[in-house]
Swiss-Prot record:
The lineage of its organism: Eukaryota, Metazoa, Chordata, Craniata, Vertebrata. Residues 239-466 form the NR LBD domain. It comes from Homo sapiens (Human). Changing L433R: Abolishes heterodimerization with RXRA, DNA binding and transactivation activity. Induction: Down-regulated by aging. InterPro entries: 1Cnucl_rcpt (IPR003074), NHR-like_dom_sf (IPR035500), Nucl_hrmn_rcpt_lig-bd (IPR000536), Nuclear_hormone_rcpt_NR1 (IPR050234), Nuclear_hrmn_rcpt (IPR001723), PPAR-alpha (IPR003076), Znf_hrmn_rcpt (IPR001628), Znf_NHR/GATA (IPR013088). It is found in: Nucleus. Changing L370R: Abolishes heterodimerization with RXRA. No DNA binding. One of its GO terms (biological process) is behavioral response to nicotine. This is Peroxisome proliferator-activated receptor alpha.
Length: 468
């Protein structure tokens, strides 16, 4: 009977080739960078919305040709006005006031002057123009009025004042009318909700696309594996391989094609090693198709695509391999077979050392109780890792990774609300996977040098060529 205590997903072990020492001492620092990225993403996502583009609906007649102003007008508001804030209200901010830009130049508004929010500079400019009845030289260029250039074209600046609704008849001595304040609150809430809804929709869309690509491209996933290991599958249970006799039986039925062409005449350890490589090559192909479906990946420079896959496939494979493992063994041959952990440990050295570290990692990884939607985002984050050596467009790839890590974090919060430390635990698992790949590659290096019959598959050799 197959024990089913742990979670499962697809794939089988992977063999490595030419490699010296995969991970550098800089790795922990690199993982720190990932954590900083995720923290900054979290801060951005939970921060308040800075309202910078609000405009009132209002008009005031301008003029054609030279501008002749209305007759006198009293002074406007005090230089600075702070609006009282009700705790919990929409305009509550660290400064205790609504943070609004000047309607004319975009500088920070000091208050509600002449019927609109304006800065001290534009308030004073409008007041002087009105009081002194200034006439400015006509300008037909419709100059854009900004903080840095607002003094260059007084004609266009005054027209901007009028167009946004400034009027000497609308003086409120810096206080915002109650109706305007209510209107502003409603506008801010609407904008915030619209932006939140839009961002949430984008994040959900990204998560959905990655999850669908995961289900589409991998032959085995955790749900399928759990059903098989629990004995709930409608078809026949997996054939258990626990000794040399059952191994030979499985080779004649489950993996007959893999042990053809002379492989069947080699010793059992070499045959198992060969089957592991064949499964790994198939998984590399699946991972390549999955990566192409990650939004933005296919648009990367081809060299960067190759580099990301070259450095990421083994980490991704060992993460997904956990899903077909439990404490007693692992599924093989598309779930049709189950090879026991004890049998793998009984193989002669160095082959007996290949799978045991993967079981140790899998038990800890499976304890996180991730589902396929979690794993799909985790694998995508592994592939789109901006610290891989030799990348050409590092900035763009880091931005991709930030987006995926952000989605992963939010998805975990939603999918596992009771485990607030799950996200940092997964970041640590990224570090553990790099170490696992390092140790695996070193072991395969030993096998390559000492076992003449255990040849490496050409694709796997290419993956490890000049990797570190």
């Amino acid at each position: 009977m197959v024990d089913t205590e742990s979670p499962l997903c697809p794939l089988s072990p992977l063999e490595a080739g030419d490699l010296e020492s995969p991970l550098s001492e800089e790795f922990l620092q690199e993982m720190g960078n990932i954590q900083e990225i995720s923290q900054s993403i979290g801060e951005d996502s939970s921060g308040s919305f800075g309202f910078t583009e609000y405009q009132y609906l209002g008009s005031c007649p301008g003029s054609d040709g030279s501008v002749i102003t209305d007759t006198l007008s009293p002074a406007s508001s005090p230089s600075s006005v702070t609006y009282p804030v009700v705790p919990g209200s929409v305009d509550e901010s660290p400064s205790g006031a609504l943070n609004i830009e000047c309607r004319i130049c975009g500088d920070k508004a000091s208050g509600y002057h002449y019927g609109v929010h304006a800065c001290e500079g534009c308030k004073g400019f409008f007041r002087r123009t009105i009081r002194l009845k200034l006439v400015y030289d006509k300008c037909d260029r419709s100059c854009k009025i900004q903080k840095k250039n607002r003094n260059k074209c007084q004609y266009c600046r005054f027209h901007k004042c009028l167009s946004v609704g400034m009027s000497h008849n609308a003086i409120r001595f810096g206080r915002m009318p109650r109706s305007e304040k209510a209107k502003l609150k409603a506008e801010i809430l609407t904008c915030e909700h619209d932006i939140e809804d839009s961002e949430t929709a984008d994040l959900k869309s990204l998560a959905k696309r990655i999850y669908e690509a995961y289900l589409k491209n991998f032959n085995m996933n955790k749900v399928k594996a759990r059903v098989i290991l629990s004995g709930k599958a409608s078809n026949n249970p997996p054939f258990v391989i626990h000794d040399m006799e059952t191994l030979c039986m499985a080779e004649k039925t489950l993996v007959a094609k893999l042990v053809a062409n002379g492989i069947q005449n080699k010793e059992a350890e070499v045959r198992i090693f060969h089957c592991c490589q064949c499964t790994s090559v198939e998984t590399v192909t699946e991972l390549t198709e999955f990566a192409k479906a990650i939004p933005g990946f296919a648009n990367l420079d081809l060299n960067d695509q190759v580099t990301l896959l070259k450095y990421g496939v083994y980490e991704a494979i060992f993460a997904m391999l956990s899903s077909v493992m439990n404490k007693d063994g692992m599924l093989v041959a598309y779930g049709n077979g189950f090879i026991t952990r004890e049998f793998l440990k009984s193989l002669r050295k160095p082959f007996c050392d290949i799978m045991e570290p993967k079981f140790d990692f899998a038990m800890k990884f499976n304890a996180l109780e991730l589902d396929d939607s979690d794993i799909s985002l985790f694998v995508a984050a592994i592939i789109c890792c901006g610290d891989r050596p030799g990348l050409l467009n590092v900035g763009h790839i880091e931005k991709m990774q930030e987006g995926i890590v952000h989605v992963l974090r939010l998805h975990l919060q939603s999918n596992h609300p009771d485990d607030i430390f799950l996200f940092p635990k997964l970041l640590q698992k990224m570090a553990d996977l790099r170490q696992l790949v390092t140790e695996h590659a070193q072991l395969v290096q030993i096998i390559k040098k000492t076992e003449s019959d255990a040849a490496l598959h050409p694709l796997l050799q290419e993956i490890y060529r000049d990797m570190y």
